A protein has these predicted regions:
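Structured C-terminal helix/loop/strand segments within mature extracytoplasmic catalytic/sensor domains
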Residues: 3-16, 32-39, 143, 147, ...
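N-terminal secretory signal peptides
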Residues: 1-9, 22-27
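Beta-lactamase-like hydrolase cores
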Residues: 29-68
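Conserved catalytic neighborhood of penicillin-recognizing serine enzymes
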Residues: 103-140, 147
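Short, glycine/proline-biased beta-turn/loop segments that scaffold the active-site neighborhood
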Residues: 87-113
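Sec/Tat-exported extracytoplasmic proteins
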Residues: 43, 79-89, 100, 129-132, ...
Length: 291
């Protein structure tokens, strides 16, 4: 018998080792669930929905429940416009005219340039992602066939869940149980994954979308708060009625795959700083568990 023969591991040892791994995984999942439930309790009756993934592992809480999207749809809208540019159906330098009749609340870019009477497609995309400009979103929605055209595009890239039914600012109504203008945390996080890991966008369009998300200023107190050294992040927030406060982020760790996190809150009256703190803790948990 050769001395180099591989050592035979007893079957009982293999089974015991496998059970230990399964037990550890179950314990970790239980700890995550407890953490998210504790965070949800801070909302005093509100709901928290979370899904985070690095493409291999994931974690979640109410991941398949519907939540009002509010402005988190705008990053996907910008991606749809970029996909049209990639397909030769749109150009970033095309000027889109608009006037006072197009104005709605929260217009940091379109309002500042109202006297100019037009802005480029690229400027509008940047505005809706970085500062969540509402008239800009409506102007771009018109170029893709409205909320229906946006939803049809989502179906074409594999999102069977997310739906947009109305325009800004009516889409932020957030009525309990209303399926209009909603998504699930799982659908949104996976949607971001398709944009950066799939074939939806060209490399140049992915870089442009990444720049806009990283340049966003509305979510610095949410998922991106207390970002560790060496990490990069971009996000798109959303806020609406009934305490609806959302954030969807992409994290780039110092090493390893991107992490996509969707965190949604609705049905609460706690102050904004409490809601932001819940999102910040979700971000911390996702980074700790998935990096």
């Amino acid at each position: 018998m050769s001395a180099a023969r591989a050592k035979v591991v007893p079957r009982r040892t293999v089974l015991t080792g496998g059970a230990a791994v399964a037990l550890a995984a179950a314990h970790a999942a239980g700890a995550q669930a407890a953490s998210f439930k504790a965070l949800e309790q801070r909302l005093e009756g509100g709901r928290l929905g979370v899904f985070a993934t690095n493409g291999k592992a994931s974690l979640g809480h109410r991941a398949d429940e519907r939540f009002p999207m509010c402005s988190t749809f705008k990053a996907l809208l910008a991606a749809q416009v970029l996909a049209r540019v990639d397909a030769g159906q749109e150009t970033l330098d095309r000027m889109i005219p608009y006037g006072p009749a197009d104005m709605v609340a929260h217009a940091p870019v379109t309002g500042a340039h109202l006297d100019d009477g037009a802005l480029s497609v690229e400027t509008l995309c940047k505005a809706i992602v970085e500062v969540s400009d509402n008239p800009g979103a409506n102007l771009l929605l018109k170029t893709v066939g409205g909320p229906e055209g946006f939803t049809v595009w989502l179906r074409s890239i594999g999102d069977a869940t997310t739906r947009l039914d109305r325009w800004e600012t009516e889409l932020n109504e957030a009525l309990p149980g209303d399926p209009r203008d909603t998504t699930t945390p799982r659908a949104m996080a996976k949607g971001y994954g398709r944009l950066f890991d799939g074939a939806v966008l060209s490399q140049s369009s992915r870089r442009r979308l990444e720049d806009w998300l990283v340049g966003a200023t509305t979510g610095l107190q949410r998922l991106r708060k207390d970002l560790p050294d060496g990490w990069r992040a971009g996000d798109k927030t959303g806020s609406g009625a009934r305490g609806s406060t959302n954030d969807v982020a992409v994290f780039w760790p110092p090493a390893g795959p991107r992490i996509y996190v969707a965190s949604y809150i609705t049905g609460t009256e706690v102050p904004m700083d409490v809601r932001n703190a819940v999102h910040a803790e979700v971000g911390r948990i996702a980074r700790a568990e998935l990096a």
